Amino acid sequence: LHSTSRRQRQMCIRDRNYTYYVPHDVYGLARLMGGKKSFVNKLQMIFDEGLYDPANEPDIAYPYLFSYFKGEEWRTQKETQRLLAKYFTTQPDGIPGNDDTGTMSTWAIFNMMGFYPDCPGLPEYTLTTPVFDKVIIRLDPKWYKEKELVIESTRQKPDALYIDNVKIGGKKLNRFRITHDELVHGGRLEFSIR
């Protein structure tokens, strides 16, 4: 009896973890779950109850799902910063699970730069709060006419967490998603953090 109840709990946790793995149709999933508010509340519960598994690759895009819904982007920013601080350290066990050919390290680096490709095969990124003040990415001249992408962030105070505004190529971006072309051809991605 004990092993059955333990197995049922493990199945329940696994089912919750895989529920949100529909990266190609987040809006359709939200409709099936009762709409935006219900979707956001259920997703937040995964984080609040400690059910999010940072070592389980299908889960790693979950913090960005909030940003698909206007007004909920702050949750992405909060959760990615919390997860970086909790699970990615300079200790010997400073990466959750194993690195699976660099998957977890790449997750951390993308987040530290302020963007993440949350849907495989879709050339778009969700923006989140960068850790670094400045990052320069040198672009391959075989593929891009631009030489580099500069990412800069300025904080109104040292512990600022939330994005106040974003500019790409000097123009204000009024959303928290950016296409690959916008990113690599914009030259400069600027975050103002409040």
Predicted regions and their residues:
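Non-catalytic C-terminal accessory modules of carbohydrate-active enzymes
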Residues: 32-36, 50-54, 63-194
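Single conserved hydrophobic/aromatic residue that forms the stacking wall/gate
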Residues: 1-9, 13
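Short alpha-helical scaffolding segments that buttress acidic/His motifs in well-ordered protein cores
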Residues: 26, 43-44, 80-83
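Aromatic- and carboxylate-enriched substrate-binding clefts and catalytic-loop regions
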Residues: 7-10, 52-58
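Membrane-embedded transmembrane-helix bundle of lipid-linked glycan/lipid transferases
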Residues: 45-48, 59
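A conserved active-site cap/scaffold subdomain adjacent to cofactor or substrate pockets
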Residues: 16-33
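A post-motif C-terminal structural segment
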Residues: 7-10, 21, 120-121
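Interdomain hinge/lid region at the active-site interface
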Residues: 39
